[in-house]
C-alpha cells in the first residue's frame, strides 16, 4: 500500500508542468491521510506560498540575477511577485517600455503590459519572465545590457609568471637565468589600480646581470553609461589611426568590448617555428606583454588581447641560447560604427621612453572619432598635436560591403619641426580589407597596404628622430596579409601570413609563413595528424632564412601519441622522434630523441617535459641533453592570487585585466567549480579566472564530483562583469551527514505530506515530508534547527547534539 501512495505523490509532482489548474481526487487515499496532505502548491503551475524567497531570475531564458530576494504577495486568489525598480532595470527594456511601468507600493505594476508573463519554477527556484523581443534593447545571447553588468567587489590581486633555466655547455661558461613578469593591482568600486612589473637575473662565470622593476602604473575605470573607459597614469597610446607610443597622462576612449561581438576589434595571430623547447616573448616598446613556452615545431599564438595594436617585437629564445627576432603588425580592421552612433578616443599627456617613468618635455593632445553615417558606411578622422613642433590630421571612410567584405581607406597628413632642419610635411595612405568567404569558408583576417611620403613622420617616428635619431627608421611601404582556408573533404586547414616592409633609410624586410595541417584515417589507424610549415625571413642585402617543417603524429595506446618531425633550415636539418602522453586532464608528459646535422656528434640529443595544471596554477618543467654539446633544464610556474573581504585564494592565472570570479561555499572545501579545474580551498574559496569582460559568463559547480555529504543549493552562476572586476558569489553549501528522520508534533500527528523542510538560519530547503512523517535530510550537522512549513503553519525540529549512527531512523518532535 505504501508503494502506491508514494507513486501517487510522484504523479502529483509530475503534474506540475500542466498549464491549467488541476484538481486531485483524494478519495483514492486512506481516509486517515486525507487531512494530512498539503498539495496546495501542486494545483497550479508556478504557484508559490506568500513570503520572501531567494531565487534566480531569467528573462527569455537568459539568467540576469542569482540569489535575488523577492516577496510574493497575495492579490485576490493569486500570488504574484513584487518586482522592484532595480530588478526591472536589469530586464534590458527599451526606454519607452520601461517608462510605461509605474511603481505602486515599491512594486512595479505590470498590468498595462499583460504580454509580460511571470512563471515560478519551484524545482529550480527560478522566476522565469517572458517579454516580447521587440520590447528589449538587446537580442543577443552573447551580450547583455549595461544595466545588468556588475563592477565586482573590492580586493587586491597579483598575477605572476615565473621562469627559471640553466644552460651548461660542454665548453664555455654555464649560465642561469631567472625572470618574472606580471601585474599587481587593487580594486575599489569601479576603479582599478594596476602596476606591471618584470624582473630578470642572469648569472654566468664571467657575467652577473640584474634588471627590471615596475614598467608602468596606471588607474582606470569603465564607464558603461558612456560606453567608454577612462585611464590615468602611465599607459600606451592605442589608436585606430595613429601609431602607438608610451606616455603618461589621461585617456577617454570608447570600449569595443561593450559592443556586440560583431562590432568588436581584431587581435593579431603570430606564428613561427621553434627548433627546441623555446620561449616566445612578445613585447611592445620594450615592455613584455606575453611570454609562453612552446615545444619544437610550428607554433601559433592567437590569444593576444585585442587592444594590442602597432608593431610587436617577437623573440624566440631556443633552450641552447640561440635567438630569432622578427616583427608583426597588429593593425586594426576597418573602423566601422553602427548607424547614428559615435565612437571616440581622447588622449593627452607627455610621451615617455620605453621602460622609463621619466617623460619628455613636451605635451600632446589627440582625438579621433568615427561616425556611423549610414547603415554600412562610417566616416572617421583624428588630430594629434604636440606643442608647436608636430601636427597631424587624418580622415577616412569605412565601408561594410556585406558579402564582399569590409574595407577602409584613410589619408594622414603630418608636419614635423626638427631643431636643425626645416619643417617636413608629408602624407600617408592606408587601405584595409577583411572578408569571410562563406562559399569556401575562407577567412582573410587582414589585408593592409600603407604608403608614406619621404617626409611623412608619425608621432612615434618623430619622437624617435628627436630623442633617438640614430635608430629611427622612416617607413615607406607596408603590406600585410593573413589568410585561412579549410578544405573540409580532406580535413585540411591552410594558413598563410605575409608582412613586407620597406623603409626610406633602411633595408627592406619580408616575413612569410604557410602552414597546412590535416587528419586522416589509414586502415585501423585513426586520427593520424600530418602538418607541414614553411617560414621565410629576408632582409635586403642578406641571405634569406628559410625553414621547412614536417610532422606526423599517430595515436598509440590509451591517450598517447608517437610522432616524427623534421626541420630544415638554411643552416641545419633536424630529425626527431617523440612520445607524448596525457595522464589525465591535469597531467601530461613527453619525451623525444633526435639528430641535428650542424652540431657535434650529429646533434644527438634527448629531451623530456612534464606539465601539471592545478587549481593554484600551472607548472611546466623540461630538460635536454645534447651529446658533446650542452645540457639544459628549465621550469616555469604561472598563477594568480586574489584576496577580498570574503576570503583569499591562489588560483590559475588570470588574463590581463579580464574579470575573475571568487566563489564562496560557506567554508566547505574541495567543491569543484567550472569542471574539474578549480576547487575550493581549505577555507571554501575558489577563484575562477578567464572570465570575459562585458559578456554573459556561466560558471557551474560539478555536481557529479561533490565530496561525500556535501550539498550545494545553487550550482550555476551566470553574470556579466565589467573589465578588471573581482566578481563574488556565495553558493549556499552544506557539509555533514545524511539522516533519515520521522517528524511528529506533540500530539503525535505527522506534518502534512509535501511539507517543506528549511534550514532555520539560511532558509534553504533541505527536504520534503513524505508519508507518515518520513523525511531524508542530506548534508546536515549536529545540533541544527530546521523549520517545517505547510501553508501558513510551521513547527521546528532540532537535531541531536551527536549523530553517531546515521543508519538508524531518528524520531524528531516538531514544536
From Swiss-Prot:
InterPro entries: Fimb_usher, Fimbrial_membr_usher_CS, FimD_plug_dom, PapC-like_C, PapC-like_C_sf, PapC_N, PapC_N_sf. Could be involved in the export and assembly of the putative YbgD fimbrial subunit across the outer membrane. Residues 1-21 form the signal peptide. Disulfide bonds join 795-814. Its main location: membrane. The keyword Protein transport does not apply. One of its GO terms (molecular function) is fimbrial usher porin activity. It is a multi-pass membrane protein. Keywords: Cell outer membrane, Disulfide bond, Fimbrium biogenesis, Membrane, Signal, Transmembrane, Transmembrane beta strand, Transport. Pfam families: PapC_C, PapC_N, Usher. Belongs to the fimbrial export usher family. GO terms for cellular component: cell outer membrane. This is Uncharacterized outer membrane usher protein YbgQ. It is found in: Cell outer membrane. PROSITE patterns: FIMBRIAL_USHER. One of its GO terms (biological process) is pilus assembly. PANTHER family: OUTER MEMBRANE USHER PROTEIN (PTHR30451), OUTER MEMBRANE USHER PROTEIN YQIG-RELATED (PTHR30451:SF4).
